Amino acid sequence: MRNTVRPAIWCGVVIGVWLIFRDVARGQVVNTPPVPDWIQAPGNKTNEAAFFSVGVELPPKMLKVIFLGASEGNMEVFVNGRAIGGGSGGSRAVSMDLTSSMDPGKNVIALRVLNPAGPARVSALIELNADYAQERWVATSGRWLARTTQQDGWSKVVTAPEGWEPAVPSGRVDATGEKNPFEPRNLLDAYNSWKLALGSGVATDPSGLTLPAGFKAELIRSALPAEDSWISMAFDSKGRLTLAREKRGFLRLTFDKNQTSKIEVLDHNLLECRGLLYIGTSLYANANNSKALVRLTDDDDDGVFEKTEELLKTEGGVGHGRNHIKRGPDGWLYIAHGNNVKPASQISPRSPLQRVAEDQLIPNPWDASMFDGDVLAPAGHVLRLNPANPAEVQMFAGGFRNPMDMAFNADGELFTFDADMEWDVGTPWYMPNRVLHIVAGADYGFRRGTGRFRQHFTDTLASVTDIGLASPTAVIFGTGAKFTEKYQRAMFICDWAYGRILAVHCGETGASFQGRSEVFLSGRPLNVTDICVGPDGALWFITGGRATQSGLYRVTYGGSEPSAPLNVTPTPPRSGAAEARELRRRLEAFEMPSGGVAGSKLFEEVWESLAHSDRWIRYAARGALERVAATQWMPRAAEEKNNSRLIAAALAVARMEAPERASAILERLTRVNWRDLAEDDAVGLVRALSVAFARGGAPSSNLSSAVLSQLEAVYPSPIAVLNPDLCRLLVFLKSSKVLAQTLPLIAAATRSEDLVEYPLVLRYLKEGWDIEARRVCFDALGRAGKLAGAQNYFRAIQSIRTEMEKAMDPTELAKVLRTVTNNLAMKAPPPPVAAKVHAWTLEELIPHLDKVSAGRSEAGGKAALLKAQCTACHRVSTDSTVASGIQGPDLSQISARFGRRDLLEHIWNPSKVIDEKYRQTTFVVQDGSEITGVVEREEGGAVVVRQNLLSEQTQAILLISVRERKISNISSMPEGLLSVLTLDQVLDLLAFFETASKPPVKP
């Protein structure tokens, strides 16, 4: 059933221009919208209807379509001829979620407006959020069509028939000092829709939620102010629901006919329990801010916990912290930890995940200064703990960023929904939000900085499916729900930011799964924090987090399809996929035979499986091999004729043995005939050599020569994903040919990932460079700077370019820059020392804001940028010839988020709002003095801070000397920057930001 707003009886507006959004490179994002114009229908009069319409073609894998509109008069909104809802008033835009109303491909969004007090004016912004973090916008402008007479089918217009004319723009919505209806503090894009729940006092009305036909959502309870925000939940054996409060402690709800009949505050001091689980009368709580896993026991079953035991204590941060817990089919507890949690000290040597390392062939020097730069392998991880013997704690799997939750399917397989690092979009190391099948001993490849494992690496595993824009929270399978079979078998994953619960349908693929996702439930706001199947067979979920309004909801199915719980017990005949999973599990459980491997049938199964066609089985077989002493099988590996087994064994040796013991089998790899290799084996061979050298250091001269001879002959490879790996390995071995072999790849590159990765790797070469090679790399960085990407993408471009410049002779650099100036963003010069003109106040400047639009000087704006030192820290324009810095937030689209007055206020008072990622930290040291700055990195027992973002100078503070550290509420951006500008220069500066944010005009 789709719930929509009942249309009002209003008159309205239409446009008919098709805006087609072409695919951009995977992993790229443009998150800044254009500023809408107010538009009118030509000749429209007071109390006369105006009609407007625009055609929109949806990109593939559309996630969310949000309509934002304001009108001088009453407005009604239509999608493909269907009335959706409406609003009135020009001071604040109304918001509507159009996702479920849109059709694949072409759509028409039409408006009808009637203003009894004057001509009808309207402004609108349509937000299209597509997969792979693509975001596009449609704003009202003169490209819309309009008319003042109604005709049949007007709300489905896709062309410009008789009677339609271009709409008449009457200025941007922020053109005057009046209130902007799209003011960002009042108006939130889809990603920030959770903020709508801040201070709302009541949870989102379920009648506004979108669900499949036959499903119904009920709001069981809205949290009262004293009940805090809710972040996790669990039913006990009596059907009572325990809710974890964001700050501390729990609530327990007792129900009577699905209504809350009793609420109890469980007076406990555990802080921020992100995970709750009942086993019998014991409640297990993963208390993030208490940094402990705790068991609370109600021995006499009287509803009071008499005993509290700390089962596991962990150190580290709390952002990506101690998350959900689940009970596995083996009876053990499975505990999800984000990458800020340091692995527990008592990890068992019997853990499935062993021998984890960074495995960076060429460590990147600025990885440690990036976000989460202190994170080391295994990063985010899943622990396994035996509740009967809590001392037995095993590392089950790792290589995650922040797995908030996990879920077992009906067959006992474990899954999670891991988070991306949104700053990395556009880079070759970007990992999307991904659904992962978690198997014993697996490393899913998350590493700090640029070191993320690529999905094709042999020593990691692929995702079940990638999800685009999202903020992952809870997950659950529909097992036991009174739903249709499709949804009983589905995995439900929760997207906190976009207000969605997605159903992921996992199809068997060999020993693992591949999935496709669909939106099951959505709302705005609907910041879902936890989800479970209740004892009544309904799907229960809660909203909350970040101090937002919480609600408890219940979803049931009342349609005509069968909804009895499925018999999930497998019956013969077993599928081939089930048999493949059984083989994978046997390999994961394999232990070294007590009598050695000679004559062992189990070991023979391991050895044969190294060449299995299924990647997951090969991975499990290599893990089993690593649990056997290498001395027992290395001689056999050296004589192995099958390339797949040889390469898998070589990777195992590289992970297990010292370099001198691994050299024989690595030398054997150099004698493999490359032309005989399947694609997987070619990838595996390069990865085995890379891991061996990353862990063991540079090889002997003989082995190095043999590897160079083999790989230089096959580089570049027709296997596209392999070329960056080959390039990296050849650079590490100081190949004399790799530079010349890579330049054609760079020149032909169009993807942002390739334009960044090759220069990133080649900058380590010390010899062989000439003017042309430098020019090709600088040109690639210039082209990369014109593509879309997130913050770390542009930081990487800047850092690579800076390092390349430092490695060049000034005369040579000047020659190169003369040939690529038009393509390369200029580095910001040192900020000039300017005399103060006047200590401006807001009261003096605000009355002049209406002059920003009138004939301002672009040259004056650029000069003001330099004089006010904006370019020393910020990227200020998409024009790559404008100087830029990267220490601060990207301002190239700032006026799309802030109106004139807000932008002026933020420049005048930088500490008004500070992005968490740019907050300074104050360190109080032993002598009582304070040092304040932005943390660059922590390493070697010291923290390195930059006290002045305009200087390259940093200061190291010994951690043992730190008495206290506290977050500063003072921005690193100094006050008074406008005091060096005249009034005209201030206005030119604001005009420059507005112009820089406008999308390019299409011919």
Which role fits each region the language model picked out?
Residues L188-F590, P830, V876, S884, ...:
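Beta-propeller domains with acidic blade repeats across secreted/periplasmic ectodomains
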